[in-house]
Amino acid sequence: MKIAILYREEREKEGEFLKEKISKEHEVIEFGEANAPGRVTADLIVVVGGDGTVLKAAKKAADGTPMVGFKAGRLGFLTSYTLDEIDRFLEDLRNWNFREETRWFIQIESELGNHLALNDVTLERDLSGKMVEIEVEVEHHSSMWFFADGVVISTPTGSTAYSLSIGGPIIFPECEVLEISPIAPQFFLTRSVVIPSNFKVVVESQRDINMLVDGVLTGKTKRIEVKKSRRYVRILRPPEYDYVTVIRDKLGYGRRIE
């Protein structure tokens, strides 16, 4: 099997550790930083870092490429193994004993160009700026208006990222939906809405505001169009992986109080 290993900038040592182990059984055809430019073509991409590293690596992968993350960051929603579990991973790899998750991207079109996001796209004011009036038009429906600091449009993958911190719901990865969440809206009852993923969303503000794609500032714009992309990646999990256990352990959600 031809494997690429991509690592977070300061995690080269951990990447070398995995390379040494994996290369005993498989051909490592690429080894480098996840934020380096270019596409990666391999049978499997191994990522060393946290969720941010996985997001960068996913955009370099060909459609449908399986990916597996080794946790070397903080929360690690998108990582599946720890470095101490390398032997367990190699055993699972020999037998292809994984649970697979399909994680799809959204496509964002604006005057800044076309972008892909696995987590979310955000339009928000500068810290020194005033609140903005934002129009959100969902395909086949009339417009919604928010007077807020901004708005986040996220995938199910991104529901445990920025959207969660501003009151959005946790969405299981298998759901085919998009989540629209206003940031600090003027009216308390203005909450997140969840829509079918096949609906296009147009967001327009009164003035140029910041656009962030997966947390990375790309520039200022007034208008974006968001729709589900055909691009996707496959995240490999250990066979016993359970999403509820993950959100309970990492977020404390649904934890029993004794």
Swiss-Prot record:
Broad enzyme group: transferase
Gene Ontology terms describing biological process: NAD metabolic process; NADP biosynthetic process
Gene3D superfamilies attached to this UniProt entry: Probable inorganic polyphosphate/atp-NAD kinase, domain 1, Probable inorganic polyphosphate/atp-NAD kinase, domain 2
Catalytic center residues: 51
Primary role: Involved in the regulation of the intracellular balance between NAD(H) and NADP(H), and is a key enzyme in the biosynthesis of NADP. Catalyzes specifically the phosphorylation on 2'-hydroxyl of the adenosine moiety of NAD to yield NADP.
Known catalytic reactions: NAD(+) + ATP = ADP + NADP(+) + H(+)
Family (UniProt): Belongs to the NAD kinase family.
Gene Ontology cellular-component terms listed: cytoplasm
Protein known as: NAD kinase
UniProt xrefs under Pfam families: NAD_kinase (PF01513), NAD_kinase_C (PF20143)
